[in-house]
């Protein structure tokens, strides 16, 4: 599953489209929500987690992009990323019941949350998309 973002009125063809798979998008959008909780509505934040064609207008989009870029230079991103990675390291294994024929076994596996990735390069690409998209639709 992935998230396709379509620019409303891009400055150029380069900024017409942005895509992320779920493992990268969820941490990215959570970071955006934290940086932008004073400008995004609860509905904006919630809808960012779904492919419901929700639109973030140009004004908000530009602010989001600028805040992301600023967070790289003032260590907000670094601090958030360090905390994110530390939390992932601390996750316990998860137990699952496995039924096959007459055996009921329990297996342990790494938490699926460890698959989430907060990637600075992707976040920078998203920030530039936001600034130049004219607003965007999350599909």
Model-identified regions with their sequence ranges:
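Acidic (Asp/Glu-rich) sequence patches and key acidic residues
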Residues: 1-139
């Amino acid at each position: 599953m992935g998230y396709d973002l379509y620019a409303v009125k891009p400055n150029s063809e380069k900024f017409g489209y942005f895509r992320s798979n779920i493992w990268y998008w969820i941490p990215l959008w959570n970071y955006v929500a934290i940086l932008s909780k004073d400008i995004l509505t609860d509905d904006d934040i919630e809808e960012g987690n779904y492919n419901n064609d929700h639109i973030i207008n140009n004004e908000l989009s530009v602010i989001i992009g600028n805040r992301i870029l600023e967070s790289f230079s003032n260590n907000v991103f670094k601090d958030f990323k360090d905390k994110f990675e530390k939390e992932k390291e601390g996750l316990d294994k998860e137990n699952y019941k496995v039924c096959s024929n007459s055996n009921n076994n329990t297996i342990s596996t790494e938490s699926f949350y460890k698959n989430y990735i907060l990637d600075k390069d992707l976040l920078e690409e998203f920030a530039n998309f936001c600034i130049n998209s004219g607003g965007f639709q999350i599909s």
